[in-house]
Regions:
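Residues lining hydrophobic/aromatic ligand-binding pockets adjacent to catalytic sites
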Residues: 10-313
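Ser/Thr/Pro/Gly-rich low-complexity, intrinsically disordered segments
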Residues: 5-6
Length: 313
């Protein structure tokens, strides 16, 4: 057989493989990153971090040894200094899969009634400057606009969201709403049109609170777990720690993993953020989720395994 005939035969074989049953296109694989909301909590000493840890101990780098994401929580209270954000980006570089998400400044979400057009623009500019080092490093997956339960579904509030989307358009945005009035198809379509992620939430479902789901409205899938502490959730006398003092049992973890798998099928990247932070329970829940997703035990911080023995395999 001459070379030309051999080439024709080879081309025919390749074509048959493509058109026939010999060729199977690869299944779509998307990334799920799981990690805690925040990394600086006093009650994590002795539970997650060593007691009496020295100034040289790097808590963020420690978290990046075990998880591929963390949600920046301090940015909710005030925009971080750009040099601090740049430091965070450097400290996670050893984990090449690592990406941040970040909560937007509370002035944009919880103190909006006092803002004017001018002050809103200035506040958004402050957020842009603060997050620029992480965004420019290519490791800011999403900026989360987290609204309280009192933020109801209305034309005025949807118009306010549009303003924020316009002012923060250079970021990949996500929106968390907690009132069930937002759980309607026109709102999800509105987010899709603006390429903004809907943040699914697991929270105590009290009254007209939004229920956990698996909505995907952009390339990013987002899910936040707040725990199910019904007793303290709306108790004004309960402190922050009490509201988020909850450890998910295995059946609830499996339920949430089912939702995450649905999100994973429809998003390019999926983020599951555990916010039940008291005494390291957010890390415990994150590890439980990772084990269910991967069907294999993840690496566990030694002190955390001592506190929560079910993690020790």
């Amino acid at each position: 057989m001459d070379r030309f005939a051999l080439l024709l035969q080879l081309c025919g074989t390749i074509q048959a493989m493509i058109q026939g049953s010999l060729f199977e296109p690869p299944a779509r694989q998307t990334t799920v990153r799981v990690g805690p909301a925040g990394w600086h909590y006093k009650d994590w000493e002795g539970t997650v971090y060593p007691s009496g840890k020295g100034r040289s101990f790097d808590a963020l780098a420690f978290i990046a040894d075990y998880f591929d994401t963390v949600e920046i929580n301090s940015s909710f209270y005030r925009p971080p200094r750009p040099e601090d954000a740049a430091s965070w980006a450097r400290r996670v570089r050893k984990n090449r899969r690592f990406k941040f998400t970040a909560k937007a400044w509370q002035r944009l979400t919880h103190e909006r009634e006092a803002s004017t057009e001018e002050s809103l623009a200035k506040d958004c500019e402050a957020v842009r400057r603060s997050m620029a080092p992480i965004a420019e490093a290519g490791i800011l997956a999403a900026l989360l606009l987290q609204f309280p339960w009192s933020f109801r579904c209305s034309p005025e509030n949807q118009e306010y969201l549009e303003k924020l989307f316009r002012l923060l358009r250079e970021f990949s945005l996500a929106v968390e709403v907690r009132h069930g009035g937002w759980d309607r198809e026109p709102f999800y379509q509105f987010l899709k049109e603006n390429r903004v992620a809907f943040c699914n939430v697991d929270q105590p479902v009290i009254g007209n609170s939004i229920r956990p789901g698996s909505q995907v409205t952009s390339r990013v899938g987002y899910f936040r777990l707040h725990g199910r502490n019904y007793k303290s959730w709306f108790n004004e006398e309960a402190g922050r720690d009490a509201r988020y003092d909850y450890l998910y049992p295995k059946p609830e973890v499996q339920q949430i993993v089912g939702l995450l798998r649905t999100i994973q099928q429809n998003a390019e990247e999926t983020y599951a953020i555990t916010n039940n932070h008291f005494r390291g329970q957010s890390l415990t829940t994150a590890l439980d989720i990772l084990e269910e997703l991967d069907a294999r035990p993840p690496d566990v911080p030694p002190l955390l395994a001592a506190t929560y023995p079910h993690l020790a395999h």
